From Swiss-Prot:
Proregion residues excised on maturation: 229-259
Gene name tied to this protein: chpC
Name listed for the protein in its UniProt record: Chaplin-C
Sites bearing Pentaglycyl murein peptidoglycan amidated threonine, chain numbering: 228
Domain Chaplin, chain residue ranges per copy: 39-79, 119-159
Biased composition (Gly residues): 84-112
Keywords for the protein's UniProt record, in alphabetical order: Amyloid, Cell adhesion, Cell wall, Peptidoglycan-anchor, Repeat, Secreted, Signal
Membrane topology summary: Peptidoglycan-anchor
């Protein structure tokens, strides 16, 4: 019993380390290209393409049966490239020639392309494309049966946007305005006559003209610390951690006593 428990804990710890250390990025895609030409007959010369691209990222996760201080942080998952796109065309010739062509695709994900030409017949010469792109991200999760202080922070998942549906740069930019003509400079004002020393009485000068130190009001703001770590308050985390540690100890002693 003791050896089985020890092997199970070691296996779980190894699996958790592998999952937590995996920061994957899916760059692969799926594509299809087909052509049908010169296929006379009924319902002939048709092309159906359905490439499926399902990238799955699993990173920054912890799985513990009995675990303490097993964090997973700073992992990133990303699916680069665009989404699915493609064309759907179908022109069936009733007793004539059916021609259909289409090119679909994007810079990533799943894409399909092809054409159908010179296929006489009823319901022939059709071309159907159904590219599917379904990215799945699972990151930054913590699963504990009996565990304490196993945070998952700083884990990111991202899927790159499609290239076909993006707006070309510069379409919404406002052109720079024309420079205004500078106005004619006005006549300079005649400088005032400097006042004599007898014009001002000592003590009548304002505070703005008096040399010396001046008090400047500082902007008031509430002091705040950067928000880091978990949202769980410390007063609740410590009792929960102690209880989890005690529960793990009790389970271990029961397993040891039953041997």
């Amino acid at each position: 019993m003791r050896q089985a428990t020890r092997k199970g804990l070691m296996t779980m710890a190894a699996a958790t380390g592998v999952i937590a250390a995996a920061g994957g990025a899916a760059h692969a895609d799926s594509g299809a290209h087909g052509t049908s030409s010169g296929s006379p007959g009924v319902l002939s010369g048709n092309t159906v393409q359905a490439p499926v691209h399902v990238p799955v990222n699993v990173c920054g996760n912890t799985v513990d049966v009995v675990g303490v201080l097993n964090p997973a942080m700073g992992n990133a998952c990303a699916n680069q490239g665009g989404g699915a796109s493609g064309g759907h065309g179908g022109h069936g010739g009733h007793g004539g020639y059916g021609d259909s062509g289409g090119e679909g695709g994007s810079h990533g994900g799943s894409h399909a392309g092809g054409h159908a030409t010179d296929s006489p017949g009823v319901g022939s010469g059709n071309h159907v494309e159904v590219p599917i792109d379904v990215p799945v991200n699972v990151c930054g999760n913590s699963i504990d049966v009996v565990g304490a202080l196993n945070p998952t922070t700083g884990n990111d998942c991202g899927n790159g946007g499609g290239g076909d549906h993006s707006t070309p740069p510069g379409d919404h930019e406002t052109p720079p305005g024309e420079p205004h003509n500078p106005g004619n400079p006005g006549n300079p004002d005649t400088p005032d006559k400097p006042s004599g020393p007898d014009d001002e009485t000592p003590g009548d000068s304002t505070d703005g003209n008096r040399p010396g130190a001046q008090t400047v009001d500082q902007p008031r703001g509430d002091a705040a610390l950067a928000e880091t770590g978990s949202d769980l308050p410390l007063g609740l985390a410590l009792p929960v951690g102690a209880g989890a540690l005690l529960a793990g100890t009790v389970l271990y002693r029961k397993a040891r006593a039953s041997v």
